[in-house]
Amino acid sequence: MNYTASDITEFFQKYESKVTHNLVAHTKFRPYNHSKAQIDAMANESKKALRYALNCFGKSLYPNHSNYITRKPEIYRPLTLATIENINETTDEEQTIHFNISLGNLPKHLTTTHIEILFRHAWHVKAQQSNDIYITHVNDYPAETKKWFSYILKDTNKSKSLAWETSGTWDVLNCWIPHNAINTD
């Protein structure tokens, strides 16, 4: 069975109430004037960078217990729903490959500004990606969460295969659902 944009949206919406922050993180990669094979390689490098940044970010959430997210990820690792955008050939030289990420299960004492500082350090300094990051608390986002999910999956609505291809929009390997933390509410 091939996934559709609706299937992915439905999956994301199961965890909508647990999402506290939405984040856009641009990479250093620009698909302009590159072949599909080159763009796929850039996307794979981007996904590796995101995996590394998410691990660094997760550890920074618990500075006195940085091993929490590796020893007990089902409780302490942040909820992460990720999509990747601009992984197609383009004539727009300004476009970058970037991630749209919904986060949850973050320590409640952290402000949006503090979360941004921690993620920016992990993404820009540690993973050596672009400093172009935008983060907002879901209560401050100008639209409801359902519209955010529609926005981050807009490429799958334009090109159906992006919903189910392994090099498609949904970055499954960088998604994480901390079931024990979610079920303890």
Question: What do the PLM-derived regions correspond to, one by one?
Answer:
Residues 1-97, 105-185:
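Right-hand nucleic-acid polymerase module
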